[in-house]
A protein has these predicted regions:
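Non-cysteine beta-strand/loop elements that form the S-adenosyl-L-methionine
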Residues: 2-5, 115-117, 275-281
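Structural motif
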Residues: 1-2, 55-57, 84-88, 250-251, ...
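DPxDG-like acidic metal-binding loop motif
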Residues: 35-42
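Loop/helix-junction capping segments adjacent to catalytic residues or to phosphate/diphosphate-binding pockets
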Residues: 35, 67-68, 229, 304
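Histidine/acidic-residue-rich, glycine-tolerant segments that coordinate divalent metal ions
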Residues: 6-26, 32-33, 45-177, 262, ...
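Generic recognition of short, well-ordered alpha-helical segments
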Residues: 40, 68-72, 130, 197-200, ...
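Metal-dependent amide/peptide-bond hydrolase catalytic core
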Residues: 140-356
Length: 356
């Protein structure tokens, strides 16, 4: 059996309230902790390699937050014709007490889509707004429609969230700008029923509101719905048993689904996968602030549990006869890239890049 272990490598630009001893860096989202777990688990597994049958691949993914690194890693694995049985990843979480392994089955992290849109009106002087066409008016209409989209177009029983994180226009107090740019994201679990419906409905809303306000609209970025993370049921059950044996019942909990998104979803559509959370919340040490917040920090002692549980689970998996369900895009990476709306030229460039 072949079992890849995942870690993500990235730095985030944040105000550094919780600083590292290394100038200019901080945990930010815990990816350095993930890397520490992966490297230490690898050392342990190497020391006990005679105790299990199979191979383990360590995968270090660059740029997870930007979503630009996974495609090269997947293409590399595909180009080497590596036959993978299952994948595993771990992510720190302030939602659970320090050292707790939170394990969930089925949909565990949401899929997402991102948008970056420019509205073009007509500029003018602030003293003569009637001679201009303020793109802000159009945006207000769009935002109002967006706020009611959830209630009017979707069942309350279908989990979804969306938000606008950036709005940019003008920099003069007495000048009406000719354009406004806004950016945001949307999250879901049911890609077909919810993700694609929002994709179509929100796009129609933007176009119709722009026409009504005599504005032009440019979809600088409007991604197709990306995939949610789906945990294999049998892998989840095995991890529950394995990690409970290793850490005890007090340190293994059932994970609640999260509306956060992660590029590990792309692996979970290639191979049976397991994505678990490692609690880092410790009030005495001041850890427990939200991911990506400037006060985020982690209790580094939690990494000991993460490492021990990871190594134990890998050994138990490789020595098991567990049955795993095939995933939709197993051995079909090019089809997967096409489903992500990538052109043939872009796909070829991905494969060429990994050979340079």
């Amino acid at each position: 059996m072949l079992f890849p272990l995942m870690s993500q490598i990235i730095t985030l630009s944040k105000p550094r309230i919780v600083k590292s001893k290394n100038e200019g860096v901080m945990h930010a989202c815990g990816h350095d902790g993930h890397t520490s777990i992966l490297l230490t688990a690898a050392r342990i597994l190497n020391e006990v390699k005679d105790d299990f049958a199979g191979s383990v691949i360590l995968c270090f993914e660059r740029g997870e937050e930007s979503g630009k690194g996974y495609k090269y890693l997947l293409a590399y694995l595909d180009s080497k014709n590596i036959n993978i049985d299952a994948c595993y990843a771990i992510h720190v979480s302030p939602d659970y007490k320090s050292g707790v392994m939170a394990i969930g089955a089925g949909g565990i992290n949401a899929g997402s889509l991102a948008f970056d849109i420019t509205i073009k009106g007509n500029s003018g002087h602030g003293s003569r707004p009637y001679e201009a066409n303020n793109p802000l008016d159009c945006f207000v209409d769009i935002y109002s429609g967006l706020k009611s989209l959830r209630m009017n177009n979707f069942s309350p029983f279908d989990p979804m969230t969306y938000s606008i994180g950036a709005v940019q226009m003008g920099n003069k107090y007495n000048q009406i700008p000719d354009k406004l740019r806004f950016r945001g994201s949307m999250r879901f679990f049911d890609r077909e029923k919810v993700g694609y419906k929002f994709y179509e409905d929100f796009k129609s809303l933007i176009i119709n509101k722009s026409k009504a306000n005599n504005c032009k609209v440019i979809f600088d970025t409007y991604t197709k719905p990306r995939f949610p993370i789906i945990n294999d049921l049998n892998l989840s059950a095995l991890a529950l048993t394995s990690m409970t044996d290793e850490l005890g019942e007090d340190f293994v909990k059932e994970a609640s689904p999260s509306m956060g998104s992660d590029t590990f979803a792309t692996y979970s559509y290639q191979w049976p996968s397991l994505y678990i959370m490692l609690g880092i919340n410790n009030e005495e040490k001041g850890s427990g602030a939200a991911l990506h917040s400037p006060k985020f920090d982690l209790d580094e002692k939690a990494l000991i549990h993460g490492t021990a549980a990871t190594a134990r689970f890998v050994v138990d998996f490789l020595n098991s006869d567990i049955e795993l369900a095939d995933r939709p895009y197993k051995n079909r990476l090019r089809d997967f890239f096409i489903e992500e709306d990538r052109s043939d030229e872009e796909i070829e460039d991905i494969y060429e890049t990994i050979t340079r």
